[in-house]
Amino acid sequence: MATEEHQRLASIVKSCHESLRQLTKEYGATAAWQEHTSPRNAKQLAEYAKAMKQLAAIWETNDGKVELQARSRIKWAIDYITKYFFTEGIYLQKRQREQRLLESYRAEGKLGEVQCRLMEEPPDRLHVLDVGSCFNPFSSAPHLEVTALDLCPATEDVLQADFLKVEVVPGIREPELEEGSVRRLPASHYECVIFSLLLEYMPSAEQRLQCCLQAYDLLLPEGILVLITPDSQHVGKNAHLMKNWRYSLARIGLLRVRFEKLPHISCMVFRKAISRELSQHWASIHREEGMCEEIRIPQDDS
């Protein structure tokens, strides 16, 4: 059962989300985001960041309880990243699968010659970009070199950034800041990008897709985008939305390689395919009626 403090913190988070959704209904997503991220709203954003950090601590520090451990989004993400790049070499298994798919599409005459890009052997420390990080929870993993970004950082090791406004630039190797905010990030640089509880914060389906397009450009070939989104429903309740996410991300070159429903969250991993054309062709043959290129969440219909 939630404690009084837990309920108070959750109320702060919910209030911030509802405020942004209301602004979006009144002024549209672009104007709403502009207002939400303006200095006039700095106090609410700071309260939100503090509440999110305290809420996370309630769950993440209860490692001894199996039920709470199962809910740990941080642990889940680190475990899969480790398996994908190191202990199980999943990236090689997925490469072979994509190469077989490519051969079959070519044999059927459905896809011509395409350029494939493969990842070199993963480094000992992976370059990870954690967007909407809040308090840099992945920094404790010794094999992750984390660049943490947030609209309103809760700790000093998180860089301030409005991800929707950040440029992805080829040829640079480090984030570039102006006036204390990240303005540019290196293209094709990261083995992993993490959106943990980020996309549902964005007020529109178009902005969520824009975030994913940014992630694609930031990732190295065969790198992964880890998506963690709130979901307290049973596993099939939001299946149509998750299918549409899978289709939409395949259209931009990201193929889903993992989906797991945990209590209160859904955890997904999408991989930058060896060929964008391959991913797009997969999407075209798996498209179902009513699917479209957008990232919708249940709150969009409320």
From Swiss-Prot:
Changing L151A: Abolished binding to S-adenosyl-L-homocysteine. Gene3D superfamilies: Vaccinia Virus protein VP39. S-adenosyl-L-homocysteine binds at R73, G132, D150, D162, F163, S196. It holds the Pfam family Bmt2. Changing Y201A: Reduced binding to S-adenosyl-L-homocysteine. Changing F163A: Abolished binding to S-adenosyl-L-homocysteine. Keywords: Methyltransferase, S-adenosyl-L-methionine, Transferase. Belongs to the BMT2/SAMTOR family. This is S-adenosylmethionine sensor upstream of mTORC1. It comes from Drosophila melanogaster (Fruit fly).
